[in-house]
Structure formats: structure tokens, C-alpha cells
Design a protein with these regions (language model features):
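Terminal, compositionally biased segments used for targeting/anchoring and flexible tails
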Residues: 1-68
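Short loop-to-helix capping motifs
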Residues: 13-15, 147, 234
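PAPS-dependent sulfotransferase catalytic core
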Residues: 54-190
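Conserved nucleotide-binding/hydrolysis micro-motifs of P-loop NTPases
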Residues: 169, 234-238, 304
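PAPS-dependent sulfotransferase catalytic domain
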Residues: 184-200, 210-213, 240-310
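Conserved phosphate-donor/acceptor-positioning beta-strand/loop module used by diverse small-molecule
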Residues: 219-244
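The conserved 3'-phosphoadenosine-5'-phosphosulfate
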Residues: 288-357
Length: 389
């Protein structure tokens, strides 16, 4: 086992060995390659698999983890144990959500199916020192179900961008109640640096989870110059969408209780009332962004091809003819299911609530919504760079 442990550590930090192993098309091929690399002819497949499984359960020492920087993607954070999990990337993400991209990484790379290295959270700082400091091109905040997935998907079609759409590892660090604000800020910066280093030549766009807006001040302190877009929508339509498919923050998930008081024990008389409370808190935090980051607000009904191109320009992303064509094609697809053509659903959403429920939502949230909607002519600044190649 000691010899295999050292060989395992060497593999984690060797670009050449990883490239060789990534050529394997099956577990049998990979085990054969590992047997050659590790001079492990005396070990059967079962013995190798058992040894790898045991090593996956151990923390990679911090001094070894440093060598993983620029090769491996930190993808998950285990809050209880404060452990970071890593995998090998598979090209730039274009999926609607980052967890779908991670699924692709595991499905298409046999090595990811066998090797599941984990490190301490503290190892991130040393790892990040091995890669360049990343300055994100832009942040996307949203109230959920506001078109942010469409926007991030369109931007992911640009050759200059890499989009992290609701990255699980970023949000889990932010919601860890055991970490102080300065620790969260430092670890988020380390994670963005490490993730960005895997996609050289591309600028980072982060679409945050809806509840991450409660950490807007922390994120602005870390990245004071990053442009921010904030997406909003008619609250009746937002809540109707959650009625059909409930998001984490609308489900009463106790893991979010430390993020904001509204996620704690609810005294609401109904599920709808609780969700109105949550959306109200999100909208108030969205309004408070004005004092934190000077965002550009955009309503769902103002999101179209031209506004996407203007946001790309605001983020400093060039968009040539091919990029514009890919964006136009993406705009025609369902944001969350790109294989399905988009069908407007405003009428269906309007029919979810009865008149009394719709009135309760409107009375409570309409004024907040109207205050967030920019005039159409000021929805997104017009920047010539959006159309430059």
C-alpha cells in the first residue's frame, strides 16, 4: 500500500500521467495503464480497485494537493467534514447548470470514475498560490426563475467565456456556518482562481444561486470592480414556477438557515405565505445591491438577443458573427433543457394561482418589483464592444 500511495500521489500531480490515463476508454483499459505506471504487475484488478478506493477515502496531504492546482477541478465541498472533492475537467461547461457539467465530467472520463481525490479545505490557499489570480468578467445575480439560466447559457456559447452557473462548491462554502466572513471570502477567491486556471484564454462569468445574494457585500469586497447584472421578474410568475418545481431556497431547506433569517423556522400560515416571505427578502436584498455594487437590473421581459449582446459587452466579452449565431440559436431553446424548443409559458403561470392568491402576492411584492424594473431604454448600457470581434 505505501508504494501505491506514493504512485497515486504522483499521478494526481503529473499532467503527463493524467493525459495517458485519460486515453483509457474502459475501466479495464485504465487499470492496465495504472498497472504499467505503478509497476503493479503483482496486483490483480480487484486489489488495485480496493487500494484506489481506500486512497480515495484518505485526505491527500496538503503538500501533495498543491501539485493538483491547474490540473484538477474542485467540485464539491463537504460542510460537515470541511473536505474538498476534486475531479478532472472535460472542456468548458456549456450546460445550463454546473452540476450537469460535473455529471458530464464523470460520465465521459473513466479516470474520474475511479479516482476521487479529496483534500482539506485549508489546502485551497496553498493550491491557489500556484495559479494566476483571476478577475471575473461578470457576476449574475437573480431572484430565481428570471431568465438567468438563459443568460448564462448564451454567454457560455462565447469562445472567450467560461461560465460557472450555480457552482455547488462556491455556494456550499458561502453557506457553511462554521466559516467566518473573511474565511469565506478567501476560499471563494481561491476556488475561482483554481477553476479559472483550467480554462486559459477564457474569462470567468459566475451565475450565483438566488440565495447567494445575501453574500453580495462579501463578494463585492472580494471583487470590487466586477460588473454585476441582476435579473428580476413578475413575482407571480416566479412563485408559479416554484409551485411547479420547487427550488432549494423555497423548500424550507434547513441548511440555508444561517444564510438569512427568512430561511429559519417559519411562522407562515401556508407554503405560499412562506414563499412570499422568501421572495420578499430576496427582492429587498436585490434592491440593496444598488449600494453595494451598482448593478444593471434587467427584467425577464427585457431579456432578448440584443440585451444579451450588450451584457456580453458590459462583461468585456467579444462577440463575433459566429458567437452571435450561437447565442441566437440558444435563445430559441428551453434554458434548462437545451434539447427542447422554448415555448412561452406566461399564460400557464398566470393560471396557477386563484384571484385571492394572486392578489396577496401582488399586494406584498408588486411595489418591490416595480422599483427594480429599469426603463426599457436603460435596461442595459449600450457598449460598442458587444459587437466587436
Amino acid at each position: 500500500m505505501p508504494d501505491l500511495r506514493n504512485a497515486y500521489y504522483t499521478l494526481l500531480c503529473s499532467a503527463a500521467q493524467l493525459a495517458l490515463c485519460r486515453q483509457a476508454c474502459s475501466v479495464a483499459d485504465l487499470l492496465a495503464a495504472l498497472r504499467r505506471l505503478w509497476s503493479a504487475d503483482g496486483h490483480s484488478d480487484a486489489e488495485l480497485l480496493q487500494a484506489i478506493d481506500a486512497l480515495n477515502r484518505e485526505d491527500v496531504p496538503d503538500q501533495v494537493a498543491v501539485g493538483m492546482a491547474g490540473l484538477w477541478l474542485p467540485h464539491s465541498y463537504q460542510v460537515r467534514s470541511q473536505r474538498m472533492l476534486w475531479c478532472l475537467p472535460d472542456g468548458a461547461p456549456t450546460e445550463p447548470f454546473h452540476d450537469e457539467y460535473l455529471s458530464r465530467c464523470w460520465q465521459t472520463t473513466v479516470l474520474n470514475q475511479l479516482l476521487r481525490p479529496r483534500t482539506s479545505l485549508q489546502a485551497l490557499a496553498a493550491c491557489a498560490q500556484r495559479v494566476p489570480r483571476a478577475q471575473p468578467a461578470g457576476f449574475i445575480f437573480h431572484l430565481s426563475r428570471c431568465g438567468s439560466t438563459l443568460l448564462s447559457g448564451c454567454l457560455s456559447e462565447l469562445d472567450e467565456a467560461v461560465v460557472f452557473s450555480e457552482s455547488p462548491v462556491l455556494t456550499e462554502v458561502l453557506v457553511d456556518p462554521a466559516l467566518g466572513l473573511q474565511e469565506k471570502r478567501a476560499y471563494v477567491q481561491c476556488l475561482i482562481d483554481l477553476k479559472a486556471s483550467l480554462f486559459p484564454g477564457r474569462r470567468v462569468v459566475v451565475k450565483w444561486n438566488a440565495w447567494d445574494i445575501f453574500h453580495a457585500q462579501l463578494l463585492r469586497d472580494a471583487y470590487p470592480a466586477v460588473p454585476v447584472v441582476a435579473l428580476v421578474r413578475d413575482p407571480v410568475e416566479i412563485l408559479a414556477s416554484h409551485h411547479a418545481q420547487t427550488g432549494r431556497h423555497m423548500s424550507g431547506d434547513p441548511s440555508l438557515a444561517a444564510v438569512a433569517p427568512v430561511f429559519g423556522m417559519s411562522a407562515a400560515s401556508s407554503v405560499l405565505e412562506h414563499r412570499i416571505h422568501v421572495l420578499e427578502a430576496l427582492m429587498e436584498a436585490m434592491s440593496a445591491l444598488r449600494a453595494v455594487s451598482g448593478p444593471v437590473y434587467l427584467d425577464y421581459r427585457q431579456l432578448h438577443g440584443d440585451s444579451v449582446l450588450r451584457i456580453a459587452g458590459m462583461f468585456g466579452l467579444r462577440c463575433g458573427v459566429q458567437g452571435q449565431q450561437r447565442i441566437a440559436q440558444r435563445m430559441q431553446r428551453n434554458a434548462k433543457l437545451p434539447g427542447v424548443r422554448f415555448e412561452p409559458d406566461g399564460t400557464r403561470k398566470a393560471a396557477v394561482f386563484d384571484a385571492a392568491q394572486a392578489q396577496a402576492i401582488t399586494q406584498r411584492l408588486s411595489a418591490l418589483h416595480q422599483a427594480l424594473i429599469p426603463p426599457a431604454e436603460h435596461a442595459v448600457p449600450t457598449l460598442e464592444v458587444a459587437d466587436a470581434y
